[in-house]
């Protein structure tokens, strides 16, 4: 009897389902992507018991013809590709024809659908076997009901996380698909509670407001750029709105949400030194390219893709974000850290909006009766080690503390805010991305946005007080001089000269055999900044001179730290190594806290700061200065009374 035999269709489908259907969120992803491919404009997801009991996805798409309904549940049956050429020119989210077959192999599935013809069809498939098929009255579109997921593979259930975790993963993937498709209205309900709702009006900022909250949506800036092969656009957060995880960045390639480490690094690189250490921006990055430049058939869930000309795309993305942020005034408002309930009262919001230019006015439509929350949509499994990130939820769901509280809770106040917002935004003229001129990827002077400061005093030997016509400024003297030093050293290191300081006593460095091999392999990186290590035995090196910009008395520590970078990070680019060196030197030579400056030194520092390319942050991303506007000061001293009290400013 032969030992090799062909598996049954049922068993084959169960094996295939192991790759495609990992958890309830996988079912939701596949069904929602099918709805998007069906040109739906409204997609509703209903969940029971975090999807383990029931998942129902309804859409108003084009539906499935009666003759195709049964075929749709066969493996590798699809309407989206036909030839090999189609496989390398995919424009749809799905194309393998595995989703329905894989879901039906491990669940009880009932699908009801109808096209414009008006003839509806219902099919019932359980464990891969068709139980029944009949005509049924149904509107145009498709409803897929999935019950008892993994009923015939109980071992899979043992690896499910808690209901909160599984629900968080469902909300995460639907939220990302909603951000990738702002022209589609999405809802997610869990056990009768609305968890996610987007308007589907094609406004990405409005979609973000429904997912992350109004305050986050308002802190986003739009950007765009293109070259011969790529077009990038989207919304990304200002440097003060960050998270402890990279997963708040959503990358969308030709309408498909993907994960790509190099492109994520490119986005972060666009911020330069504006981000705090360990903090990452939020945003949605849309990338459009010829379908021939992207291979989506490399991962079972299609979450990872291969991109042609990835380095070119990364450079375009970094420069687009860098240029856009260079146009922003990045001085934090000193009152931003006050309690939200005090900060965002209705009348204060109107005052804040009066300061926003029409070009940056967000087109968010707060929805009456809906609590817009600043929620997390990150994949919980990916970020559990970094920071707990609860998913968006209704008050009845105990998924964890929300990152922010709703700005408004009362429907009447929402209505009042909506009226005022519409009045304030009435003069805003929306401009299509295609109609705006492309950004000039070139240096933008920050000095034009830096205030003309007059020095007042020093506080605790740590902070400098200064004023300008628009209010009071408080500067961190260490961060300020660190920024000034950084830009000096970045230029000095970038223009490596032959000027070397010879040591009276050479420095000898001893390393392990493995480290010595690595140092020799990366010696060119060290030499790119003027540091020369000569062999001095099998595992030792000698340094006889060093660049003149090394700080006296710290030569050996500086050299050891630079070598440690190479040993830790491996093959760094020359640019990255020079950047790290400039940051280290600027920090070592900056004045520290509790160091008292005389008036001349303080004024000299304030004069140098506007000359910096980025005077707003130290190289580690901390703010250099904060701003109390005249209005802020008047509010703090109650010189501006609330409108319900007097509406007048005191003399």
Swiss-Prot record:
NCBIfam families, sorted: mutl, PRK00095.1-3
Keyword terms of this UniProt record: DNA damage, DNA repair
Protein name: DNA mismatch repair protein MutL
Superkingdom of the source species: Bacteria
GO terms for cellular component: mismatch repair complex
Annotated GO biological process: mismatch repair
CDD domains tied to this protein: HATPase_MutL-MLH-PMS-like, MutL_Trans
Keyword DNA damage: yes
Source species: Lacticaseibacillus paracasei (strain ATCC 334 / BCRC 17002 / CCUG 31169 / CIP 107868 / KCTC 3260 / NRRL B-441) (Lactobacillus paracasei)
Pfam family, one: DNA_mis_repair
PROSITE patterns registered for this protein in UniProt: DNA_MISMATCH_REPAIR_1
SMART domains the UniProt entry points to: DNA_mis_repair (SM01340), MutL_C (SM00853)
């Amino acid at each position: 009897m032969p030992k090799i035999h062909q598996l049954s269709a049922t068993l084959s489908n169960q094996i295939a389902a192991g790759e495609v259907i990992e958890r309830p969120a996988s079912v939701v992803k596949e069904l929602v992507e099918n709805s998007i491919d069906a040109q739906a404009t409204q997609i509703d997801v209903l969940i029971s018991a975090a999807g383990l009991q029931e998942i129902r996805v309804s859409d108003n798409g084009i539906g499935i013809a009666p003759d195709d309904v049964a075929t749709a549940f066969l493996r590798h049956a699809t309407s989206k590709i036909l030839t090999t050429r189609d496989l390398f020119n995919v424009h749809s989210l799905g194309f393998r024809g595995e989703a329905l077959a894989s879901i039906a192999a491990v669940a009880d599935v009932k699908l009801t659908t109808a096209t414009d013809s008006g003839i509806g069809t219902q099919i019932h498939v359980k464990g891969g076997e068709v139980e029944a098929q009949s005509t049924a009255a149904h509107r145009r579109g498709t409803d897929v009901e999935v019950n008892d997921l993994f009923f015939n593979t109980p071992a899979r259930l043992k690896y499910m996380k808690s209901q909160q975790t599984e629900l968080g993963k469902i909300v995460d993937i639907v939220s990302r698909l909603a951000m990738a498709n702002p022209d589609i209205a999405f809802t997610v309900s869990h056990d009768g509670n609305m968890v996610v709702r987007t308007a589907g009006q094609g406004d990405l900022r409005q979609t973000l407001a429904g997912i992350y909250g109004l305050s986050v949506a308002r802190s986003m800036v739009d950007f765009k750029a293109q070259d011969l092969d790529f077009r990038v656009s989207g919304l990304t957060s200002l440097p003060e709105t960050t998270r402890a995880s990279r997963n708040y960045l959503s990358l969308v390639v030709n309408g498909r949400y993907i994960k790509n480490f190099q492109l994520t690094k490119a986005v972060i690189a666009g911020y330069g030194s504006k981000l705090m250490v360990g903090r990452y921006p939020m945003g949605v990055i849309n990338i459009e390219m010829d379908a021939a430049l992207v291979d989506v058939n490399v991962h079972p869930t299609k979450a990872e893709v291969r991109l042609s000309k990835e380095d070119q795309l990364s450079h375009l993305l970094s420069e687009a974000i860098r240029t856009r942020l260079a146009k922003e005034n990045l001085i934090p408002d000193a009152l931003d850290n006050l309690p939200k309930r005090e900060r965002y009262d209705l009348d204060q919001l109107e005052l804040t909006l009066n300061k926003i230019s029409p070009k940056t006015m967000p087109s968010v439509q707060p929805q009456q009766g809906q609590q817009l929350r600043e929620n997390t949509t990150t994949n919980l499994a990916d970020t559990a080690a970094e920071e707990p990130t609860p998913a968006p939820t209704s008050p009845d769901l105990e998924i964890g503390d929300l990152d922010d509280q709703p700005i408004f809770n009362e429907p009447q106040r929402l209505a009042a805010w909506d009226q005022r917002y519409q009045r304030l935004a009435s003069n805003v003229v929306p401009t299509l991305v295609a109609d705006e001129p492309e950004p000039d990827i070139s240096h933008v002077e920050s000095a034009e946005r830096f205030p003309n400061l007059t020095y007042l005093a020093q506080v605790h030997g740590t902070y400098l007080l200064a004023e300008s016509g628009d209010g009071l400024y408080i500067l961190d003297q260490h961060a300020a001089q660190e920024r000034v030093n950084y830009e000096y050293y970045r230029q000095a290191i970038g223009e490596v000269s032959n000027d070397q300081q010879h040591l009276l006593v050479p420095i000898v460095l001893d390393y392990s055999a493995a480290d010595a091999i690595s140092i020799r392999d990366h010696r060119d990186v060290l030499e790119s900044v003027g540091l020369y290590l000569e062999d001095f035995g099998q595992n030792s090196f000698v340094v006889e001179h060093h660049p003149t910009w090394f700080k006296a008395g710290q030569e050996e520590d500086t050299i050891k730290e630079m070598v440690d970078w190479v040993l830790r990070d491996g093959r760094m680019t020359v640019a990255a190594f020079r950047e790290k060196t400039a940051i280290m030197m600027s920090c070592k030579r900056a004045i520290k806290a509790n160091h008292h400056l005389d008036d001349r030194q303080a004024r000299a520092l304030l004069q140098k700061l506007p000359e910096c390319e980025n005077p707003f942050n130290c190289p580690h991303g901390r703010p250099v200065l904060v701003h109390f506007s005249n209005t802020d000061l008047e509010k703090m001293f109650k010189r501006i009374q609330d409108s319900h009290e007097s509406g007048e400013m005191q003399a």
